[in-house]
Amino acid sequence: GRGIKKGNPKTTYIAYGAETRKSMLADDSEKLLNWYKEKGVTPKEYYLVVGRFVPENNYETMIREFMCSKTTKNFVIITNVNDKFLDELETRLHFKKDSRIRFVGTVYDQELLKKIRENAYGYFHGHEVGGTNPSLLEALGSTDLNLLLDVPFNREVALDSALYWTKKSGSLARLIETADKMSGSEIEAYGAKAKERITKAYSWEFISSEYRKVFLGK
């Protein structure tokens, strides 16, 4: 407001933090295997989204484009479903006829969620409001291949460590098919870049050092 502008306060921006460590769960963990069996999905055979189930996160675009793609992988959506919004999406998209679309509920076990992220073939991030998002940082720290909506703050966070799509019809569908054809070494290279980006700019060690500079002058 006007008072803030008049005061001309000195401000400092400090981002969220994220981890790059691996999940403590093993690939043969009973908890993990039971989750996969219950949801009917296979490691490295699904694209993933984790986030609030609200229109501004572009679920409609992601689901529509996924349905238009020729991928044989599943689309796993981890969210607390809002029935009204879900019904609206079904009315517009008829996604229930596509067996690849999997709404699997929520996952509150953080080690299990981290492992599910690690085992995703790719991660979709459709947020376009709100600035730097913790779920994007977590994805970059855990998932090798990230497909992000092309908005300034997503590019500012991920730089060249991710692939980008727009809301234009066909953009994400084509990118999914491109991603499906990528070699293991190409995907690993993106994963290494993403983790390097988190380590340099968003690790908790780096964020803590930024706070020390502000409060302790160190």
Which sequence ranges carry the predicted segments?
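Short alpha-helical segment that forms part of, or immediately flanks, the ligand-binding pocket
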Residues: 114, 136-141, 152-156
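Conserved acidic donor-binding segment of nucleotide-sugar-dependent glycosyltransferases
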Residues: 162-170, 178-184
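Nucleotide-activated donor-binding/catalytic signature segment of Leloir-type glycosyltransferases, i.e.
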Residues: 88-111
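Conserved donor-binding/catalytic core segment of Leloir-type glycosyltransferases
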Residues: 36, 40-57, 63-70, 76
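A charged, aromatic-enriched C-terminal amphipathic alpha-helix characteristic of glycosyltransferases
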Residues: 185-216
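Short donor-sugar binding/catalytic loops of nucleotide-sugar-dependent glycosyltransferases
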Residues: 17, 50-54, 80-82, 107
